């Protein structure tokens, strides 16, 4: 039987000096929580992490996650053996004297680690000081997905195994579990949230729609964010397929993409553009506009050719619902736009036949397009939660299985 690895507490701060925080130089203790700007303040100006979607919540659990005034996040160390094990993992990967190529590569897929932090009033309360992956986003859409066929580690008791299996019996077959999500809806300027009960309700038949919900902003499916997420996951998969040092249990992927946008022109100009191009083509009520950086706005012209340029931000944005995706170089997704001469669905029509509801919807969609769109969406996918990571001499088949199935689900969302 395998023996559990030791978990020494190596207190060090491998991050850059400006991000290292020593308890001795923290500001004056604030004592009990006090309201500040509508948010409760804890521990030297720290506040509960507002955009947390899963895991231990500060104020609800004995341990939780806080936001430090410098923009980092503080994850309170869990009780032994989980907390010391996670601390050991971060110290091992981010050790200054680490020359292991596998671990150096792994750093790319983790939040940056800046050592440990503790408040002067409670020096024994240890927190992992980590990068806030959502920090650069204005309206971050966030999803936490537990990866692997088993959510319990090799040293779990029979009671623990039974408990974990009963929470989500499909874990072994599906290979991942949505623990929570927070999606920004542009039309209402608000967030839709789902917790772990939502993820546990998903079956083999509904998992695709359940995941795609994270990429829908209330107007359209963010296929650009889906495609970017696939690319990120594939890099993590490649790392797992080439390492036999570590096995991960009950670990997650954190997905983040930008949900907000800024208008490239005024509403009036966007409406004018919509009227101009829609007046030359037909868009039925059943057809769906989908949000993708590689799409084009199609319109009928005198010679039947395509592309209507609507500015740099719009010209590569939209197409009809009927699209063809092909896989290139491990799911590099490209779009084949049909020539209108071969597409009888687009028929010339006069302005009076324009559906007012469609035009109104287009105005809103155009207005909420992101500016300065790149070829691929700004997306972060990072590995988190390492309280159950163990040394190994074999490929982590359970994690690999989960990644592959998640990629398959995301591809099916693109191809549908």
UniProtKB/Swiss-Prot annotation:
The protein's UniProt keywords, in alphabetical order, are: Acetylation, ATP-binding, Kinase, Lipid metabolism, Magnesium, Metal-binding, Nucleotide-binding, Nucleus, Phospholipid metabolism, Phosphoprotein, Transferase
Annotated Gene Ontology MF terms? 1-phosphatidylinositol-4,5-bisphosphate 3-kinase activity; ATP binding; flavonoid binding; inositol tetrakisphosphate kinase activity; inositol-1,3,4,5-tetrakisphosphate 6-kinase activity; inositol-1,3,4,6-tetrakisphosphate 5-kinase activity; inositol-1,4,5,6-tetrakisphosphate 3-kinase activity; inositol-1,4,5-trisphosphate 3-kinase activity
How its function is modulated: the record gives: Inhibited by flavonoids that occupy the ATP-binding pocket. Inhibited by myricetin, quercetin, luteolin, kaempferol, isorhamnetin and diosmetin, and to a lesser degree by rhamnetin and apigenin.
Effect after changing residue 163 to A: Moderately decreased enzyme activity
- Cellular-component GO terms for this entry: ciliary basal body; cytoplasm; nucleoplasm; nucleus
Q: What general EC class does the enzyme of this chain belong to? A: transferase
Localization recorded for this chain is: Nucleus
Record note on cofactor: Binds two Mg(2+), but the interaction with the protein is mostly indirect.
Question: Pathway it belongs to?
Answer: Phospholipid metabolism; phosphatidylinositol metabolism
State the reactions this protein catalyses. 1D-myo-inositol 1,4,5-trisphosphate + 2 ATP = 1D-myo-inositol 1,3,4,5,6-pentakisphosphate + 2 ADP + 2 H(+); 1D-myo-inositol 1,3,4,6-tetrakisphosphate + ATP = 1D-myo-inositol 1,3,4,5,6-pentakisphosphate + ADP + H(+); 1-octadecanoyl-2-(5Z,8Z,11Z,14Z)-eicosatetraenoyl-sn-glycero-3-phospho-1D-myo-inositol 4,5-bisphosphate + ATP = 1-octadecanoyl-2-(5Z,8Z,11Z,14Z-eicosatetraenoyl)-sn-glycero-3-phospho-(1D-myo-inositol 3,4,5-triphosphate) + ADP + H(+); a 1,2-diacyl-sn-glycero-3-phospho-(1D-myo-inositol-4,5-bisphosphate) + ATP = a 1,2-diacyl-sn-glycero-3-phospho-(1D-myo-inositol-3,4,5-trisphosphate) + ADP + H(+)
Per the UniProt entry, the effect of residue 164 to A is: Strongly decreased enzyme activity
Q: Where's the motif Nuclear localization signal?
A: 320-330
What is the reported tissue distribution?
A: Ubiquitous, with the highest expression in skeletal muscle, liver, placenta, lung, peripheral blood leukocytes, kidney, spleen and colon.
What's the cofactor?
Answer: Mg(2+)
Q: Does Magnesium show up as a keyword for this record?
A: yes
Record-annotated residues binding ATP? 75, 131-133, 144, 385
Specify one Pfam family. IPK
GO process terms (BP):
inositol phosphate biosynthetic process; inositol phosphate metabolic process; inositol trisphosphate metabolic process; necroptotic process; phosphatidylinositol metabolic process
**Annotated consequence of substituting residue 196 to A:** Decreased enzyme activity
Binding-site positions, substrate: 82, 146, 160-167, 196, 388
Q: InterPro entries in the record, alphabetically?
A: IPK, IPK_sf
Spell out the family assignment given in the record's similarity comment: Belongs to the inositol phosphokinase (IPK) family.
This chain belongs to which protein, by name?
Answer: Inositol polyphosphate multikinase
Report the gene name.
Answer: IPMK
């Amino acid at each position: 039987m395998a023996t559990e690895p030791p978990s020494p507490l190596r207190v060090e701060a491998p991050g850059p000096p400006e991000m290292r925080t020593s308890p001795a130089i923290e500001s004056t203790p604030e004592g009990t929580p006090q309201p500040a700007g509508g948010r409760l303040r804890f521990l030297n100006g720290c506040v509960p992490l507002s955009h947390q979607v899963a895991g231990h919540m500060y104020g609800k659990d004995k341990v939780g996650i806080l936001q430090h005034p410098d923009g980092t996040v503080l994850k309170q160390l869990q009780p032994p053996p989980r907390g010391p094990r996670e601390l050991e993992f971060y110290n091992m990967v981010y050790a200054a004297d680490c020359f292991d190529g596998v671990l150096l590569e792994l750093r790319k897929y983790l939040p940056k680690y800046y050592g440990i932090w503790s408040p002067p009033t409670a020096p024994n309360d240890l927190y992992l000081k980590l990068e806030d992956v959502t920090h650069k986003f204005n309206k971050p859409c966030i999803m936490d997905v537990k990866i692997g066929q088993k959510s319990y580690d090799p040293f779990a008791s029979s009671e623990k195994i039974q408990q974990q299996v009963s929470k989500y019996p499909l874990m072994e077959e599906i290979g991942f579990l949505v623990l929570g999500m927070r999606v920004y809806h542009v039309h209402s300027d608000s967030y839709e949230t789902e917790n772990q009960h939502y993820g546990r309700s998903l079956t083999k038949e509904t998992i695709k729609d359940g995941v795609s919900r994270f990429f829908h902003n209330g107007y359209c499916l963010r296929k650009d964010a889906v495609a970017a997420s696939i690319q990120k996951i594939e890099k993590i998969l490649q790392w797992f397929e080439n390492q036999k040092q570590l096995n991960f249990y009950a670990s997650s992927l954190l997905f983040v993409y930008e949900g907000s946008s800024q208008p490239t022109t005024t509403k009036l100009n966007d409406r004018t553009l919509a009227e101009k191009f829609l007046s030359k083509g037909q868009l039925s009520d059943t057809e769906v506009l989908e949000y993708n950086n590689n799409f084009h706005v199609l319109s009928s012209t005198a010679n039947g050719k395509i592309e209507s340029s609507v500015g740099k931000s719009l010209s590569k944005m939209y197409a009809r619902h009927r699209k063809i995706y092909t896989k290139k170089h491990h799911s590099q997704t490209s779009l084949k736009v049909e020539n209108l001469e071969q597409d009888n669905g687009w028929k010339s029509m006069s302005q009076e036949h324009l559906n007012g509801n469609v035009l109104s919807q287009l105005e809103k969609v155009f207005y909420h397009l992101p500016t300065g769109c790149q070829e691929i969406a700004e997306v972060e996918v990072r590995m988190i939660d390492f309280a159950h990571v163990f040394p190994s001499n074999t490929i982590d088949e359970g994690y690999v299985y989960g990644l592959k199935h998640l990629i398959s689900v995301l591809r099916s969302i693109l191809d549908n």
